[in-house]
A protein has these predicted regions:
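Alpha-helical elements of Rossmann-like donor-binding domains used by nucleotide-donor carbohydrate transfer enzymes
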Residues: 4, 68, 94-98
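Residue-level signature of catalytic and energy-coupling elements of molecular machines
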Residues: 16, 69, 83
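An acidic, carboxylate-rich microenvironment
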Residues: 46, 60-61, 90
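Glycine-rich S-adenosyl-L-methionine
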Residues: 59-68
Length: 122
């Protein structure tokens, strides 16, 4: 839902949405300043292995999910960053690095520079 996201952003919070490429395109249309991170599997075989390890899906569902993952990969070029999900700790560190970099962008702090020095940061 859009309203809680907008409220959190207005409060200065960062928001993480787990959505597919189509959802990401809708967010980008509504909020061009949104930062998009595409989570890549270490390999296509890793996706299948992970799904089989869970032992919760039928063969048909596993094959459908693998095919969907391939389709999603076709859209990774529309994202700002790529994170490879081969290790949870490493993926977390990559997300953290993106967050820190984005929060420190000069463009996000123009008013601070102006207040500090009485000049434009541009």
């Amino acid at each position: 839902p859009r309203r809680p996201v907008e409220a959190a952003l207005a409060a200065g919070d960062s928001i993480l949405l787990e959505i597919d490429a189509q959802g990401a395109a809708q967010v980008r249309d509504a909020m061009p300043e949104a930062v998009m991170i595409f989570v890549l599997p270490p390999s296509m075989s890793a996706i299948e292995t992970r799904l089989r390890y869970r032992s919760t899906d039928s063969e048909e569902i596993i094959q459908r999910r693998v095919a969907d993952a391939r389709l999603q990969l076709e859209h990774c070029g529309a994202f700002d960053y790529l994170v490879v999900n081969d290790d949870l700790s490493s993926a977390h560190d990559q997300f953290q690095a993106v967050l820190v970099a984005e929060l420190r962008k000069r463009a996000r702090h123009d008013s601070l520079v102006s207040r500090f020095a009485g000049i434009s940061a541009l």
